[in-house]
Regions:
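Conserved small/polar residues in nucleotide/adenosyl-binding loops
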Residues: 167-172
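Extended, charged alpha/beta regions that create polyanion-binding interfaces
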Residues: 152
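Short flanking/linker segments adjacent to small metal-binding domains or redox-active Cys/His motifs
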Residues: 76-130
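Short cationic/low-complexity microdomains
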Residues: 126-141
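Metal- and O2-centered redox machinery and metal/ROS homeostasis
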Residues: 158, 164-166
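N-terminal cysteine/histidine-rich coordination modules
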Residues: 2-76
Length: 174
């Protein structure tokens, strides 16, 4: 493997950074292997799943930021974080893994993934459910948020990648 970064070549070590390495968002239920363009598990695009280990940290960070933005948007559409510190305290107390660099709506989704069936009073966890979604159980709410997250990722893929591929294919046929 060739190292092109002159800072690495001169010192023999990778450049120091204060940024944490981006971990794979894979959750072990990949649907790209059965033909989906967007994974139903982690919501990455199929080419991102395939090439993830070859991505630079900046490329991984770009994907991570897009995913966290979509998840936050899907979650904020149905819930409001009313006490960020309480939510974070509950995550820490319950030993729920979350990325501190993501916003509180991503944290909330991690809480719902870990314990939606055990939460009877969302206010004690620092959030409330919007009235239009209050008739759902937190498990159903979590699943709806996850579905919205996938829809946002799929719409982004369809708008910015699949459309480009259509035009590229047409140009190649001419």
């Amino acid at each position: 493997m060739f190292i092109l970064d002159s800072r690495v070549m001169s010192t023999g070590k990778p450049p120091q950074t204060n940024l944490k390495p981006i971990k794979t968002p894979c959750i072990g239920v990949c649907s790209t292997g059965i033909g989906d363009s967007v994974c139903r598990g982690c919501k990455r695009f199929s080419h991102e799943v395939i090439h993830w280990n070859g991505y630079t940290q900046d490329e991984k960070r770009f994907v991570d930021q897009r995913l966290s933005k979509f998840l936050s948007q899907a979650c904020a559409h149905k819930c409001t974080v009313i006490d960020r510190k309480l939510l974070q305290w509950q995550l820490d107390t319950q030993l729920v893994r979350y990325n501190g660099e993501h916003d509180e709506y991503c944290w909330l989704f991690q809480l719902l993934k870990a314990g939606a069936s055990q939460i009877s009073d969302p206010g004690k966890y620092g959030f409330r459910v919007h009235p239009s979604w209050a008739d759902l159980s937190l498990i159903e709410l979590r699943d709806r948020i996850d579905e919205d997250f996938w829809v946002l990722s799929t719409a982004h893929y369809d708008r910015y990648l699949a459309t480009c591929l259509l035009y590229t294919s047409d140009a190649a046929d001419d």
